[in-house]
C-alpha cells in the first residue's frame, strides 16, 4: 500500500478513537477499517503499519499512541488468519509467521503493554491451531523457548500463547481446535513433558508424526522453576491451571509442581495464592487410575501435617477479611471460598468415593473432619454451605460414618447444625442485623426471593445433618438435645408469657424458640430412621421411648397464647404422638384436645388488629393440616375412638364459627382415619357411605343453577349487589373513598352468609385425594374404592364442569360489556386480579396485605369480596376436578366428559388472564392428560389437545409480541429492581407471562413428551426411536407424536417457544428437540413433520444462534442444528438448502458445498459442531462475544455460580428424595434470511 493509503488508515483510526468525532464520521471511518480487515491483502498492510516508527507516524499525521496502531495491525493479522489461512500459499504462511516471530523477538516496544502482547499472542494461537505440525513443526517450540530466554514480557508472551492453545483445546468450544484436537494434543504433550518422560510413556513415539524433542526439559519443569520468581509466577500458575487436569501425572511429579504450588499457597502474596489453590483443586479432583503416581501427592495432602498447614492458611485467610469493607471482589474472600471448596473436595472426592478410597488411608480422617467443621462454623453462610453436602454424604456412608476417627466430630457437628437451623432470612431483620453473618449474606445473595430460597435450602441441609447424626448416635444426641430443650424452650417461657403482643416471624424470641422446636423435629426423625435401620437393639429403643414420653409430657403442659408458637408446638406434638401414642391412647387424647383447641382459637376479639387475625387464621389452618396428618400417621388408635371424635367434630360444626375450609379439614380428618386404618373393607365402605354421602347430598342441594351465566350470577346475588351499590353510591365511584358503614357491613355480612355453600366442593376433592393417597398403604382396596366413586362422579362432575363454564364466562369481555354500563363496571372491578411477586412488586408483602385490608374496611369490600368469592369458587372447582382425575377410569368414563370438559375450559378462554391460564395448565390440564387411560385417549385427549395447544400458542405469541414491542422490563435472574413504581404493573404482567410460558413448556416437554430435565438425552432419544420393541400400553409421548392432529400444533408451539427470550423455557424446549428430533426426521416419520423440523425448527435454531441473548446456550443450539443436519442426511436436504440460502454464506464461493462434504464425512458430533460453528463464523452468524469456558476445571466462586452449585446439591440422593423424614416440615425471535 502506498503512503496515501497508509495515511488514510491512520486518519480513520484517529477518527474512531477521538471523542470529538461525530457519529457519521466515526461510522464512515469504521467502515473503512472493517473493509480493510476483510481484504485478502490485509497482512501486507499490517506489516507496513508495524514497520512504521514514531517519526513515520508524525509525518503521516497520526496523533494516536503507537500501541493502538500496533493493536489494530495485529487484529488485521488475526482476522486474515481466521478467514483466509487455508487460501494462503505455503510461502505466504511462512512470510506471515516469520515476520511475526521476528518482531516478537526483536521489537521490545511492541511487547511493552499488555493489550498488545495479548493481541500478538492471539495471532500466534490462531496460526498454531491451524498450522502447528502442518507446515510449522518443531520450529514453534524453538520460537517459544527463544522468547522464554529473553525478558519478562517475552516470557509472558510465550505463556500466553501456550495457555491460549491449551484453553481453546480443552476449556473452550473452539471449532478450529476441535477439528485438529488429536494433533494439537500430541503436539502439546511433546513440548510440555520432558524428553525422558515422553520416551518412557511413549516408547514407540508419539502418533500423527509428532516428534519427541531431544534433551528437552519440557515446559512443566520450565514453569515450575520459574515459580520462584514472583514476576513470572502468575503466568506460570495460569498455564498450570490449563493443563494439570489432563497432562501426564508422571510429568507433574517429575516437575515437582505440587510442592512448588503449595509453597506459594503458604507464603505467596494473595493474588498468587488464589491461582495456586485452583491448581491444587485440579490435582485432587482429577480422574486417576488406581496405580496413578499422583496418589502419593493426594495422600500427602491428607496427612496431618498438610492438613494442619491447610488449617493455618484457612484461619489466616478468614481472619484477614475486613467485614466492614467486604465486597464480591475482596481478594481474601475470593481466596477463602476457593480454599473452602478445595478442602471439601479433597475429602469428598477421595474419602467418600468408594473406588478412590481404596488408594488412600483413613488415618487422618479425624483431622480432616475437624477442618471441615471449621468451614461449617464460618459466619458466611455461603462458606458454610460448601461443607453441607460433604456431611450429608459422609453421614450416609456406611464406612465413614462408623469409623472411630470420624465419630469424634458428632457432638460438635450436632451442636453447629442445630444452631444453624435458624431462619437467617428473618433473623437478619432484628436478631442479628449487625452481625458478620448478616453482612456476608447481604453481599453474597441479592434479592428477597433469592435470600429466602438460599436460606431455606441451607436450613434443610442442616436439618438433615442433625437427623442423620441422631440416627447414628441416638442416646448421646438425646441427652444433648434434651439439655438444649431445657435452655432454649423452657428457659424462655417466662419471657414468652410476659409478651402482650403476638410475635412476628422476625421476632428474636420466636426465632430462638423455632430453632429449639426444629431441633426436636430433626431428632425425632433421626430416631425413627435409627429404629428402621436397627432392629436388634430393643433395649436402647425402650430407653429412648421412656425419655421421649417424659419429654412429651413437658411439651403437653406448655400453654402458649401466641399463634405462631402454638403452630410450632402442635407440629412437634404430632411427631411425638406418631412415635409414642401407638400404645398410649391417653397421650393421643391429650394431643388431640390441644390441636382442636388451636383449631377453635377465638379470632373475634375486638382487641385484635388485622395482622393478629391473620396470624390466628393461619394457625388454625396449619393446625387443621396437622390434624389430618395425625390421622394419616395414627389411623388405628384413632379408629378406636372414632365415634367420640365424630361427635366432637359435629358439635364444633354446629356450635362454633368454623370457616368452610376448616370444616372440610375436620371432615377429611374423620375420612382419613376410616380409610387409612386396618379395619376390613366392608367396614371402610360403610364409613365411606356414611361420610361421603351427606357431603354429596349437601352439594346436590346447594349447587347453583348453571344453565346460563346470568342465572348463575342471579343465584350468587350479583344483580342485587350491583343495585345496592347503584342506589347508595355515585356511578363508577372509587368505593375505597367511602367508609363501610353499618348498613353496608350488614348487607355484606348477609351476602357472605349466602356464599357458604362452597365447602362441599373442596370437601369432595379432599376425600378423593385421601382415597388416592391410601392406594399406597392399602393397594388391594383401591379398585373397590374407585367403584364407590364411580357411582358418585356422574352426579357431581357434569355440574362442576358447567359451573366452571359459567365462571369463565364472567371474565369474558363480550359478556361483561353486555351487562349494561353499571353492572359491567362493577363486575369488571370485581374480577381485577392483584398480585404480590418477590422481586417485582415495589412494596413489601406486608404492605400489600395492609392495602388489601384497607379495601376491606371501605365500601369496596362488597366488590372485593365478590371477586374473591369467584376466584375461590374457581379454585375449588379446579381442585376437585383435578382430584377426581386421579381416579382414572372412574372419572374419564363419566358420560359425555370430553365434550363437557372442552366446553367448560375453552368456550370462554378469551377472558382468561395469564394467571388463570397458568393455574388451569398446572392444576387441571396436566393431571387430565397424565391420568387419562390409554384406551380412552382418542375420546378424551384427541378433541382437547389440538385446541389447547393452538390456543396456548396464540396466547403466548401475541402476548410476547406485545411485550417485546414495549420492551422487556424483568431481568430473569434479578430479584430486585430499581424501576419506578409506575412500571410495577407492567413488570408483574411480564413475570406472569414468563410463568405461563414456562408452565406451557413443562406441560409439553414433561407431560406430553415425557422428557424430564435430568434424563440423559441419548436415553430419551433411544427410547423414543426404539418404541416398537416396547410392550404394553402406548406411552403418551408416542401417542402425541404419532397423531398428526396433535403433533402439528405441538411442534408449532415448541418452535415459537424456541426463540422466546426466557432462558428457563428455552432450556426445556431445546432439551425436548434434542430428544425427539432423531425420531421426527427419520425415514419412518411423516414427511410433513420431517420438513417442519428441517425448515421451520432449523431456521429458528439458526436465528437463536445469531441472537446474543442465547450466548450461554449457543453450544446446545449448535448441537441441535447438527442433529437435524445429521439425521436428515440422505432423506431430505431442506436444512442444507436453508443454510445455503443465507446470504452471508451464499456469497462466499464454495463455502457451503465444502461444508456439506466435510459434514457428511464427520465421524463424531464434536467434529460436526466444530464444522458448523466454523461455517457460521465465516458468515458472522455467531455473535462475537468473549470466549466462554465450557469445560473449565478451575473454581468459579462468584456468588451466582456458587449458588447454582448449591441449588444442584439440594437434590441429594434418591433415597432422600423419597424419604418423608428428610423433609423440612415448614415448607408449606432478524433479517438473516431476507
Swiss-Prot record:
<dbReference type="InterPro" id="IPR016024">
    <property type="entry name" value="ARM-type_fold"/>
</dbReference>
<dbReference type="GO" id="GO:0006611">
    <property type="term" value="P:protein export from nucleus"/>
</dbReference>
<dbReference type="Pfam" id="PF19273">
    <property type="entry name" value="Exportin-5"/>
</dbReference>
<dbReference type="GO" id="GO:0005525">
    <property type="term" value="F:GTP binding"/>
</dbReference>
<dbReference type="InterPro" id="IPR045065">
    <property type="entry name" value="XPO1/5"/>
</dbReference>
<dbReference type="GO" id="GO:0003723">
    <property type="term" value="F:RNA binding"/>
</dbReference>
<dbReference type="GO" id="GO:0061608">
    <property type="term" value="F:nuclear import signal receptor activity"/>
</dbReference>
<dbReference type="GO" id="GO:0005634">
    <property type="term" value="C:nucleus"/>
</dbReference>
<dbReference type="InterPro" id="IPR011989">
    <property type="entry name" value="ARM-like"/>
</dbReference>
<dbReference type="GO" id="GO:0006405">
    <property type="term" value="P:RNA export from nucleus"/>
</dbReference>
<dbReference type="InterPro" id="IPR045478">
    <property type="entry name" value="Exportin-5_C"/>
</dbReference>
<protein>
    <recommendedName>
        <fullName>Uncharacterized protein C328.01c</fullName>
    </recommendedName>
</protein>
<dbReference type="GO" id="GO:0005737">
    <property type="term" value="C:cytoplasm"/>
</dbReference>
<dbReference type="Pfam" id="PF08389">
    <property type="entry name" value="Xpo1"/>
</dbReference>
<dbReference type="InterPro" id="IPR013598">
    <property type="entry name" value="Exportin-1/Importin-b-like"/>
</dbReference>
<dbReference type="GO" id="GO:0005829">
    <property type="term" value="C:cytosol"/>
</dbReference>
<dbReference type="GO" id="GO:0042565">
    <property type="term" value="C:RNA nuclear export complex"/>
</dbReference>
<dbReference type="GO" id="GO:0005635">
    <property type="term" value="C:nuclear envelope"/>
</dbReference>
<dbReference type="GO" id="GO:0005049">
    <property type="term" value="F:nuclear export signal receptor activity"/>
</dbReference>
Amino acid at each position: 500500500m502506498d503512503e496515501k493509503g497508509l495515511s488514510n488508515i491512520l486518519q480513520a483510526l484517529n477518527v474512531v478513537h477521538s471523542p470529538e468525532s461525530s457519529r457519521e464520521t466515526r461510522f464512515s471511518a469504521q467502515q473503512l477499517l472493517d473493509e480493510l480487515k476483510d481484504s485478502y491483502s490485509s497482512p501486507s498492510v499490517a506489516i507496513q503499519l508495524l514497520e512504521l516508527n514514531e517519526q513515520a507516524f508524525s509525518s503521516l499525521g497520526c496523533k494516536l499512541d503507537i500501541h493502538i496502531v500496533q493493536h489494530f495491525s495485529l487484529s488485521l493479522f488475526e482476522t486474515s488468519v481466521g478467514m483466509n489461512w487455508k487460501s494462503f500459499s505455503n510461502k505466504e504462511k511462512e512470510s506471515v509467521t516469520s515476520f511475526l516471530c521476528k518482531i516478537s523477538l526483536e521489537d521490545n516496544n511492541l511487547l511493552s503493554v499488555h493489550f498488545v502482547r495479548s493481541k500478538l499472542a492471539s495471532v500466534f494461537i490462531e496460526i498454531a491451531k491451524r498450522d502447528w505440525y502442518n507446515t510449522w513443526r518443531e520450529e514453534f517450540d524453538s520460537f517459544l523457548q527463544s522468547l522464554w530466554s529473553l525478558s519478562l514480557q517475552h516470557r509472558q508472551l510465550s505463556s500466553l500463547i501456550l495457555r491460549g492453545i491449551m484453553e481453546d483445546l480443552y476449556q473452550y468450544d473452539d471449532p478450529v481446535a476441535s477439528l485438529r484436537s488429536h494433533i494439537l494434543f500430541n503436539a502439546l504433550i511433546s513440548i510440555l513433558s520432558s524428553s525422558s518422560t515422553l520416551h518412557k510413556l511413549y516408547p514407540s513415539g508419539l502418533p500423527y508424526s509428532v516428534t519427541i524433542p531431544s534433551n528437552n526439559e519440557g515446559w512443566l519443569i520450565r514453569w515450575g522453576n520459574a515459580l520462584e520468581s514472583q514476576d513470572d509466577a502468575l503466568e506460570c500458575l495460569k498455564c498450570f491451571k490449563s493443563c494439570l487436569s489432563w497432562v501426564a501425572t508422571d510429568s507433574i511429579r517429575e516437575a515437582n509442581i505440587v510442592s512448588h504450588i503449595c509453597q506459594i499457597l503458604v507464603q505467596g502474596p494473595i493474588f498468587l495464592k488464589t491461582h495456586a489453590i485452583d491448581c491444587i483443586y485440579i490435582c485432587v479432583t482429577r480422574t486417576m487410575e488406581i496405580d496413578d503416581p499422583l496418589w502419593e501427592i493426594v495422600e500427602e495432602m491428607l496427612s496431618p501435617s498438610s492438613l494442619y498447614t491447610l488449617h493455618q492458611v484457612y484461619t489466616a485467610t478468614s481472619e484477614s477479611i475486613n467485614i466492614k469493607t467486604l465486597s464480591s471482589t475482596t481478594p481474601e474472600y475470593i481466596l477463602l471460598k476457593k480454599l473452602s471448596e478445595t478442602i471439601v473436595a479433597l475429602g469428598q472426592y477421595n474419602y467418600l468415593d468408594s473406588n478412590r478410597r481404596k488408594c488412600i488411608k483413613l488415618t487422618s480422617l479425624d483431622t480432616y473432619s475437624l477442618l471441615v467443621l471449621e468451614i461449617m462454623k464460618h459466619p458466611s453462610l455461603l462458606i458454610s454451605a460448601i461443607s453441607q453436602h460433604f456431611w450429608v454424604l459422609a453421614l450416609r456412608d456406611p464406612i465413614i460414618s462408623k469409623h472411630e476417627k470420624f465419630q469424634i466430630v458428632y457432638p460438635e457437628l450436632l451442636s453447629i447444625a442445630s444452631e444453624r437451623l435458624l431462619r437467617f432470612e428473618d433473623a437478619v431483620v432484628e436478631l442479628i442485623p449487625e452481625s458478620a453473618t448478616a453482612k456476608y449474606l447481604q453481599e453474597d445473595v441479592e434479592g428477597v426471593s433469592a435470600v429466602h430460597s438460599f436460606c431455606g435450602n441451607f436450613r434443610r441441609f442442616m436439618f438433615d445433618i442433625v437427623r442423620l447424626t441422631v440416627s447414628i448416635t441416638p442416646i448421646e444426641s438425646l441427652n444433648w438435645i434434651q439439655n438444649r430443650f431445657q435452655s432454649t424452650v423452657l428457659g424462655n417461657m417466662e419471657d414468652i408469657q410476659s409478651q402482650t403482643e403476638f410475635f412476628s416471624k422476625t421476632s428474636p424470641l420466636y426465632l430462638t424458640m423455632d430453632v429449639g422446636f426444629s431441633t426436636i423435629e430433626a431428632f425425632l426423625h433421626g430416631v425413627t430412621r435409627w429404629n428402621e435401620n436397627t432392629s436388634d437393639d430393643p433395649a436402647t429403643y425402650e430407653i429412648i421411648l421412656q425419655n421421649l414420653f417424659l419429654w412429651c409430657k413437658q411439651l403437653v403442659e406448655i400453654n402458649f397464647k401466641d399463634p405462631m408458637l402454638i403452630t410450632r408446638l402442635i407440629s412437634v406434638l404430632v411427631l411425638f404422638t406418631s412415635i409414642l401414642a401407638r400404645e398410649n391412647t391417653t397421650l393421643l387424647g391429650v394431643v388431640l384436645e390441644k390441636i382442636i383447641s388451636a383449631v377453635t382459637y377465638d379470632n373475634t376479639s375486638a382487641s385484635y388488629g388485622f395482622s393478629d387475625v391473620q396470624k390466628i387464621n393461619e394457625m388454625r389452618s396449619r393446625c387443621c393440616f396437622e390434624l389430618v396428618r395425625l390421622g394419616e400417621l395414627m389411623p388405628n388408635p384413632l379408629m378406636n375412638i372414632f365415634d367420640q371424635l365424630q361427635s366432637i367434630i359435629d358439635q364444633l360444626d354446629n356450635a362454633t364459627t368454623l370457616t368452610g375450609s376448616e370444616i372440610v379439614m375436620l371432615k377429611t380428618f374423620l375420612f382419613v382415619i376410616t380409610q387409612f386404618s386396618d379395619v376390613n373393607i366392608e367396614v371402610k365402605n360403610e364409613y365411606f357411605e356414611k361420610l361421603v354421602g351427606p357431603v354429596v347430598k349437601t352439594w346436590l342441594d346447594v349447587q347453583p343453577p348453571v344453565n346460563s351465566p346470568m342465572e348463575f350470577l342471579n343465584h350468587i346475588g350479583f344483580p342485587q349487589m350491583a343495585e345496592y351499590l347503584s342506589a347508595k353510591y355515585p356511578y363508577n365511584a372509587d368505593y375505597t373513598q367511602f367508609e363501610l358503614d353499618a348498613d353496608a357491613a350488614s348487607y355484606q355480612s348477609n351476602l357472605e352468609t349466602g356464599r357458604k355453600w362452597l365447602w362441599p366442593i373442596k370437601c369432595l376433592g379432599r376425600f378423593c385425594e385421601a382415597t388416592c393417597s391410601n392406594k399406597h398403604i392399602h393397594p388391594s382396596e383401591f379398585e373397590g374404592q374407585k367403584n364407590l366413586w364411580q357411582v358418585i362422579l356422574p352426579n357431581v362432575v357434569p355440574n362442576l364442569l358447567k359451573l366452571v363454564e359459567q365462571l369463565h364466562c364472567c371474565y369474558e369481555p363480550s359478556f361483561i360489556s353486555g351487562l349494561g354500563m353499571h353492572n359491567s363496571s362493577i363486575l369488571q372491578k370485581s374480577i381485577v386480579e392483584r398480585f404480590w411477586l418477590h422481586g417485582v412488586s415495589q412494596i413489601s408483602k406486608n404492605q400489600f396485605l395492609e392495602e388489601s385490608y384497607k379495601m376491606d374496611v371501605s365500601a369496596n369490600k362488597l366488590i372485593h369480596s365478590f371477586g374473591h368469592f369467584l376466584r375461590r369458587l374457581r379454585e375449588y372447582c379446579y381442585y376437585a376436578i383435578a382430584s377426581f382425575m386421579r381416579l382414572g377410569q372412574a372419572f374419564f368414563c363419566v358420560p359425555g366428559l370430553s365434550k363437557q370438559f372442552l366446553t367448560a375450559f375453552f368456550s370462554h378462554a378469551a377472558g382468561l388472564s395469564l394467571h388463570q391460564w397458568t393455574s388451569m395448565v398446572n392444576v387441571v390440564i396436566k393431571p387430565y392428560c397424565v391420568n387419562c387411560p390409554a384406551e380412552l385417549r382418542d375420546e378424551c385427549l384427541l378433541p382437547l389437545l389440538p385446541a389447547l395447544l393452538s390456543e396456548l400458542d396464540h396466547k403466548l405469541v401475541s402476548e410476547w409480541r406485545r411485550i417485546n414491542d414495549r420492551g422487556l422490563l424483568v431481568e430473569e435472574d434479578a430479584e430486585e429492581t430499581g424501576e419506578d413504581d409506575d412500571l410495577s404493573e407492567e413488570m408483574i404482567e411480564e413475570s406472569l407471562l414468563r410463568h405461563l410460558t414456562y408452565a406451557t413448556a413443562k406441560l409439553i416437554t414433561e407431560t406430553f413428551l415425557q422428557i424430564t430435565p435430568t434424563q440423559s438425552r441419548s436415553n430419551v432419544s433411544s427410547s423414543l426411536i426404539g418404541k416398537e420393541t416396547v410392550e404394553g400400553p402406548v406411552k403418551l409421548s408416542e401417542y402425541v407424536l404419532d397423531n398428526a392432529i396433535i403433533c402439528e400444533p405441538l411442534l408449532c408451539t415448541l418452535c415459537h417457544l424456541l426463540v422466546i427470550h426466557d432462558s428457563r423455557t428455552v432450556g426445556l424446549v431445546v432439551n425436548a428437540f434434542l430428544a425427539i428430533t432423531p425420531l421426527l426426521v427419520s425415514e419412518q416419520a411423516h414427511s410433513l413433520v420431517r420438513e417442519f423440523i428441517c425448515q421451520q425448527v432449523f431456521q429458528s435454531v439458526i436465528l437463536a444462534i445469531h441472537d446474543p441473548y442465547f450466548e450461554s446456550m449457543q453450544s446446545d443450539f449448535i448441537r441441535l442444528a447438527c442433529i437435524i443436519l445429521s439425521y436428515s442426511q440422505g432423506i431430505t436436504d431442506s436444512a442444507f438448502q436453508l443454510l445455503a440460502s443465507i446470504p452471508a454464506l451464499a456469497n462466499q464461493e464454495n463455502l457451503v458445498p465444502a461444508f456439506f462434504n466435510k459434514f457428511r464425512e464427520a465421524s463424531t458430533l464434536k467434529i460436526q459442531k466444530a464444522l458448523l460453528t466454523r461455517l457460521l463464523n465465516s458468515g458472522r452468524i455467531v455473535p462475537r462475544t468473549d470466549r466462554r469456558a465450557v469445560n473449565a476445571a478451575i473454581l468459579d466462586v462468584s456468588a451466582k455460580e456458587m449458588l447454582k452449585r448449591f441449588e444442584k446439591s439440594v437434590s441429594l440422593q434418591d433415597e432422600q428424595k423419597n424419604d418423608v423424614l428428610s423433609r423440612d416440615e415448614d415448607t408449606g425471535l432478524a433479517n438473516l434470511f431476507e
